[in-house]
Design a protein with these regions (language model features):
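Structural alpha/beta core scaffold segments of enzyme domains
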Residues: 1-232
Length: 232
């Protein structure tokens, strides 16, 4: 294999040769902002500053592969009239058919996309670059003039999957004399999954970056939930 560094205008997101996931998690945990608040109630800073009992902790998650039940698969068939049929488990049929039309030059009306429920989805079957075998199946079917069914190996699946980004969340909490929480602060340093697909932070906070943190109904009078956006 002859490896090449991507050019400045490349859409490929390269991984540096010296990349370390442990070092990246440390970098996230030490990032101080700026942070965007999703929830901010009461006076968290004042309560934390005056509390007799305070708890500080940092938690993180690792890169997550979708790990679906079956490896990705696709079947492509060009019909005698030049139309194309593709069998492909997916979560966005219109987007996939538009992408297939762009790749083949066919009018979308001449493309039939069958969407069988295969493999378990978990977000794996959205439209990601190079994460599905259907472009290969289409090219092979066109080349040999016959239907082609393609099933990736587990190695291919894990190599080409889009991983959920890592996150480091710094928690601070203040407790009263009976051990009940008076205040909690959770600041997540991460690039949310939706932000990772877009390649940038949107005008609004990415809810997938704060899953499990925001929108909770605990009766804590002072709370702050925020995100520090760090592009991965």
């Amino acid at each position: 294999v002859d490896w090449q560094e991507p050019t400045a205008d490349s859409k490929v997101r390269p991984m540096p040769a010296d990349f370390s996931s442990d070092a990246w998690l440390k970098r996230l945990a030490e990032d101080k902002g700026p942070a965007k608040d999703d929830e901010n109630e009461g006076d968290v800073a004042a309560v934390l500053a005056s509390a007799k009992t305070r708890i500080d902790a940092t938690y993180h998650n690792q890169y997550l592969n979708h790990g679906q039940l079956e490896p990705p698969s696709a079947l492509a068939r060009f019909n005698p009239d030049g139309s194309l049929e593709v069998w492909l488990p997916n979560q966005a049929p219109d987007m996939f058919r538009a992408d297939i039309a762009k790749r083949t030059g066919l009018d979308p009306s001449r493309i039939t996309l069958h969407s069988p429920l295969l493999g378990g989805f978990f977000g794996r079957h959205f439209l990601y670059d190079a994460a599905s075998p259907y472009p290969q199946a289409i090219e092979l079917s066109k080349a040999v003039g016959r239907p082609v069914k393609l099933i990736w190996s587990r190695e291919e699946e894990f190599l080409r999957d889009v991983l959920r980004p890592v996150a480091a969340v710094n928690f601070r909490a203040a407790l009263d004399n009976d051990g009940w929480p008076l205040a909690i602060e959770a600041i997540s340093a991460t690039e949310g999954p939706t932000e990772a697909l877009a390649g940038k932070q949107g005008e609004k906070l990415d809810p997938t970056a704060l899953e499990g943190l925001s929108g909770k109904s605990y009766a804590i009078p002072n709370k702050r939930i925020a995100q520090i956006y760090v592009k991965g």
